[in-house]
C-alpha cells in the first residue's frame, strides 16, 4: 500500500533547502501528494506554520479538488498544479476508469484558475472510444482554459508494460511482449505505439497533427501579442521593470524537484 510522508518531515527538508541553499521553488513530483484532502491540508498547514518564502507545485487530482482546498494551497505558496485530465469525453473517461466526468473537470479547472493557480492540462489521444469528435472536444477545452503558462500539446496513449492497456494490447495481438514494445513499437512518445481506436493509423496521425498545430498556433499567437505589448510598454510607458528581451523570466529560479 501507499503511505504518504509526514508533512512535518517533508517541510523539514524544504526548510533546510531554503536556509542552506537558497532554494525558493520546490516541485513535488509524487503523483499522490494530493492522495486525499486530509494529506493535502496537512502539507499546507506545515507550509503555513513555517512561513517560508518558498513557492511550490505538485501533481493533482481533480477528484479531491474544492475551491476551499485550492485557496489554502494558493495561500501557502502553490502556484501550479499538474492535472492528468486525459480526455474531455465522458465515454472515454468511463472506459479509462478515471472516476471523473467532464463536468467535474471543468469545475476543478475553473476553480483552480479563479484562486490564481496555473493548471497543467494533460491530454492523451487513442483510448477506447476516442475519435475525431473526442479530439475536437479536447482541443476546444485546452484553448478555452489556456492561461499560456505552458505550451499545450496532445500525445498518443502508450500502453506501458504492466498497465491494463498493455495486457489488452497483448490479448488483442497488437503487442508481442516487452521486447516488442521497447524495440519495435515505443520509438517516440509523440508517435503511435498501439492503435486502440477505430481510426486508421493515417487518420490517427491526421488528428494529432491538426490538434497540435491548432494548439501551438494558438499559443504562439498569444506569445507574439504579449511580446508586442511589452515592446510598447517599455518605450511608450518607460517601464523600468522590464528585464530585457533575451531574459527568460522564470518562477523556477532556485528550483528543486522533490518526492513527497
Feature-to-residue mapping (PLM):
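Flexible glycine/acidic-rich beta-alpha junction loops that bind and position SAM and/or redox cofactors
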Residues: 38, 91, 95-96, 125-133, ...
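Bilobed periplasmic-binding protein-like "clamshell/Venus-flytrap" ligand-binding domains
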Residues: 119, 149-153, 217-224
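Radical SAM enzyme core and accessory elements
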Residues: 164-169, 177-260
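Radical SAM [4Fe-4S] cluster-binding motif and immediate context
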Residues: 1-119, 125-127, 140
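Proline-centered flexible-loop/turn and helix-kink motifs
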Residues: 19-22, 52, 146-147, 170, ...
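Short alpha-helix in the alpha/beta-hydrolase fold that links the catalytic acid
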Residues: 134-138
